[in-house]
């Protein structure tokens, strides 16, 4: 069998990697071997941080709810317990948005939570 030279395929594969490395600094952008390593590492970072982002947002929502709840003389854990006992089913994302944008409505939720805890 004759030898098959893979010039076209090799060039296409390398071009794809270099294209993915667009925006990187120095040799990570231009040299194939270094660019390939950095693209692999970037993929690992992206995979990890897609999961990390979910945790970070949940932490942010909880922090915002806690700060708003403490303005109404209540801790975060007591507020969430009170809302659960009052059968108010609202997720943390929406609760944090209410705490930021609508102080009056959040105050009413806190009052209902306090009543449910009594």
UniProtKB/Swiss-Prot annotation:
Keywords: Ribonucleoprotein, Ribosomal protein, RNA-binding, rRNA-binding. It holds the Pfam family Ribosomal_L20. One of its GO terms (molecular function) is rRNA binding. InterPro entries: Ribosomal_bL20, RIBOSOMAL_L20_CS, Ribosomal_protein_bL20_C. GO terms for cellular component: ribonucleoprotein complex; ribosome. GO terms for biological process: ribosomal large subunit assembly; translation. The keyword rRNA-binding applies. The keyword Ligase does not apply. PANTHER family: 39S RIBOSOMAL PROTEIN L20. Belongs to the bacterial ribosomal protein bL20 family. Binds directly to 23S ribosomal RNA and is necessary for the in vitro assembly process of the 50S ribosomal subunit. It is not involved in the protein synthesizing functions of that subunit. This is Large ribosomal subunit protein bL20. It comes from Staphylococcus saprophyticus subsp. saprophyticus (strain ATCC 15305 / DSM 20229 / NCIMB 8711 / NCTC 7292 / S-41). The lineage of its organism: Bacteria, Bacillati, Bacillota, Bacilli, Bacillales. The gene is rplT.
């Amino acid at each position: 069998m004759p030898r098959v030279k893979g010039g076209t395929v090799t060039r296409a594969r390398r071009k794809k990697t270099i294209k993915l490395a667009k925006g990187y600094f120095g040799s990570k952008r231009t040299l194939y071997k270094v660019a390939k390593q950095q693209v692999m590492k970037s993929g690992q970072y992206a995979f990890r941080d897609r999961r990390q982002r979910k945790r970070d947002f949940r932490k942010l929502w909880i922090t915002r709810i806690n700060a708003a709840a403490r303005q109404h003389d209540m801790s975060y854990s007591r507020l969430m317990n009170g809302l659960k006992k009052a059968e108010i089913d609202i997720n943390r994302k929406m609760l944090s948005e209410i705490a930021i944008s609508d102080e009056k409505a959040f105050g009413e939720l806190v009052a209902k939570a306090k009543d449910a805890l009594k």
